[in-house]
Design a protein with these regions (language model features):
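Alpha-helical linker/hinge and terminal dimerization helices associated
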Residues: 45-46, 67-88
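Interdomain hinge and pocket-entrance segments immediately C-terminal to HTH DNA-binding domains
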Residues: 56, 62, 85-103, 117-121, ...
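A late-sequence structural motif
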Residues: 106, 252-288
């Protein structure tokens, strides 16, 4: 007799995501006592504690964290199996990760077409750096991600979908930049570690023997552009982002060396793509 059922995993995942029994019960349309009983019975069958109390909430134990990855994968496979039997209609959920640049500029028209073509598919989009998105993909928190090169492909499947022109930006009115050596002792304004564009800029500096004075880590392109415009430092970003940025006209653009001027964004995923992801891949192929 199996100790784990899909219903067990569904209830467990809901409690883990919501961080408490009351919120999970509301989402599951169950009474809280029923959810509590199901979790206790599940823990008893497994012989291990999955949650522990933290104030008014519950948090996962080490065993719970391990189970969550399996639960995400098994529930997704169950959804995919159900989708495959729905007369070819693409339905279910598609959890995407994306760089902020792609999410704000490249993806809106694509997601709009996808939404119109597949109304029974629920799309979730979250943003992050390339490294952060690859970790979420490895932890089964997302189904696919739009990431920038360079990245460690490993066993992932990948397809190049966008080509971005990268530019160096400085405050308006500053001197002409002829190379990385002209930026000695400058502050680099960038996303935190894990950003591929930051890595490209740092590698360019290192090749020229230049050491940035310091780094200012920010969480959005709007903040980066504003700080550069105020004279804080220099940054690297896609020209398409600047074209749509609120303060895009308040900075000075500089061409980068040809070898690093163009950067590709890839859609990456693990394993065989399910129905919703296959539909997105087809849409990207047709629209290429």
């Amino acid at each position: 007799m199996r100790r784990i059922s899909l219903e067990d995993l569904h209830i467990f995942r809901c409690v883990a995501v919501e961080g408490g029994v009351l919120r999970a019960a509301d989402r599951l349309n169950r009474v809280p006592s029923n959810v509590t009983t199901r979790i206790k019975q599940f823990e008893s069958r497994l012989g291990t504690q999955l949650f522990r109390r933290q104030g008014r909430n519950v948090v996962l134990t080490d065993a719970g964290h391990r189970l969550l990855g399996h639960a995400e994968r098994l529930l997704r496979l169950a959804d995919e199996a159900e989708e495959d039997l729905c007369s070819g209609v693409v339905a279910g959920s598609l959890r995407l990760g994306s760089l902020e640049s792609a999410a704000s500029v490249r993806l809106p028209p694509i997601l709009s077409r996808y939404h119109a073509a597949h109304p029974r598919t629920h799309v979730e989009l979250q943003t992050g750096t390339t490294a952060a998105l690859l970790r979420r993909l490895d932890n089964h928190q997302i189904d696919a991600a739009f990431v920038s090169e360079p990245f460690d492909k490993g066993s992932l499947s990948a397809v190049a979908v966008f080509a971005e022109e990268l530019v160096l930006i400085t405050a308006r009115g500053g001197p002409r930049i002829g190379g990385a050596q002209d930026l000695a002792d400058q502050t680099v304004v960038a996303f935190p570690h894990g950003c591929s564009y930051r890595r490209l800029l740092v590698d360019w500096f290192a090749a020229a023997g230049v050491t940035p004075r310091r780094f200012l880590d920010l969480g959005s392109y709007h903040a980066i552009v504003a700080c550069v415009a105020a004279g804080t430092g220099v940054a690297i970003m896609p020209a398409s982002v600047l074209d749509n940025a609120v303060m895009g006209d308040s900075i000075q653009r500089h061409e980068l060396p040809e070898a690093m001027r163009t950067n590709r964004t890839n859609l990456v995923w693990a394993g065989e793509p399910g129905g919703p992801l296959s539909a997105l891949l087809e849409l990207l192929r047709v629209g290429a």
